[in-house]
Amino acid sequence: MPLAPRVAVVIPCRNDAVYLDACLSALAAQTHQADVVIVVDNASTDASTAVARAHDAVVVHEPSIGIWPAAARGYDEALDRADIIARLDADSRPHPDWIAKLVRAFVSDPALGVLTGGAEFYGGTPLQNYLGEHWYIGGGHYWIKKWLGIPLVFGSNFAMRARVWERVREHVDRDNARIHDDLDLTIRLRRSDGVRYDPQLRMPVSARPVQTVSGLSRRVFKVASTFAVSWPEGAAWRRTQPSAGSASSDEWAPGGDDWAPRYGR
């Protein structure tokens, strides 16, 4: 990989034009610019495609509705365009140094294959934002790490080397819109992929997923569905143990209706 790796940012989007406009504006304000921003139009009927093009993003279309089909389509598009594939969602609001942190991390550590971070919820009540950050996302990180032995890849805030996606792209259940795309990806990863969680890599995201009991419950129950379709690969006892010479730790710190606008991701 060159010293300055090429970075592609992938954004799956379905009928989220207003959020997408703010997200793309935040990407335009990055201290380190992406080489390409890829917006995957997932059969939108609003102005999402027009918004993406107004920001000079590359627009690709995925007619199969669902986050996993859309995200996978974007990762495929990025394979020949980038060394690092970064991912966020239309309602993400990346801090100005988000891409710079990603690039610094991957350049400084060749063993790093996937880097993910946490969330800062906006738009909800203080209680909703707190529960979203510490119970929904924080709890997911805690329990998935204990079960799988690697950090949970958070779909609204992560990046991976292109070679990692090239290895797993035919193994993930990419056409299944009824499972968590990021959890399914996590299940297909191994310690040897160099998966790390950086607690300082935080992403403002909409509180829409935690603003209704039904929306939150649906997402929690999808965890079971995701493990079910991947079984037994997601079984804790089948996970590869780290070798004695493994150089990576799990943390790095720098010196469907899933698209329903009411609920968000």
Feature locations, PLM:
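Short, well-formed alpha-helical segments that are part of the catalytic scaffolds
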Residues: 15-29
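Acidic helix N-cap motif at the loop->helix transition within catalytic regions
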Residues: 18-21, 46-54
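A conserved acidic beta->alpha catalytic loop
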Residues: 26, 33, 41-49, 92
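Glycine-rich, basic loop-to-helix element that forms the pyrophosphate-binding segment
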Residues: 62-80
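Short beta-strand-to-loop acidic/aromatic patch adjacent to the donor-nucleotide binding site
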Residues: 81-93
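Conserved donor NDP-sugar-binding/catalytic core segment of glycosyltransferases
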Residues: 97-127
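Short, flexible, basic/aromatic active-site loop/helix in glycosyltransferases
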Residues: 117-121, 131-151
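Acidic donor-binding loop at a coil-to-helix junction in glycosyltransferase catalytic cores
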Residues: 176-185
